[in-house]
């Protein structure tokens, strides 16, 4: 079973990825993990990726695609995998098709976890952290007993810059703009399966299982 998992930040992709790889016994392959492994193993592509990252530059497609090609050729990916964070562009999606074709296989499905932007905003901007002990709260899902104070030590709660409304909204807008052409690409190929990510976590996974039952 060869899958790509998609979803905007806050959609619950990580939770579903954990359940998918456990149930179907396939490796969870994320771009971050691939880069780290390639750099740790000091491969040629890993060295190239490191040089770009050390300079604060984006890793070009030819390097990213090469690292993906190496990873998907490994033994543990022969019977399936869950790709997370790749592809990000239509060009990368086309290259993924070429990589899989060279390996004598193809993608089975692309699962997209859909959540309304307003819901994502609530999920992502509600996080507050205790300055003293680092305990995390969420103003909707896990609020402190006293607003602005930590339950454990009474420490002041603060919000990281990444979790502030303007930052989150900008990140979501950028992601939505990037993702749309990719969703259209896979929809035209008949590979795209969208799931309502606003349900309970277990209900989302039930929907995932229904899709994967046909493969």
From Swiss-Prot:
The keyword Iron-sulfur belongs to this UniProt entry's keyword annotation: no
Keyword annotations from UniProtKB, A to Z: ATP-binding, Cytoplasm, Kinase, Metal-binding, Nucleotide biosynthesis, Nucleotide-binding, Transferase, Zinc
Database matches in InterPro entries: Adenyl_kin_sub, Adenylat/UMP-CMP_kin, Adenylat_kinase_CS, Adenylate_kinase_lid-dom, P-loop_NTPase
Catalytic activity, reaction form: AMP + ATP = 2 ADP
Region ranges (NMP): 30-59
GO CC, any one term: cytoplasm
Subunit: Monomer.
HAMAP family according to UniProt: Adenylate_kinase_Adk
Protein name: Adenylate kinase
Annotated source species: Listeria innocua serovar 6a (strain ATCC BAA-680 / CLIP 11262)
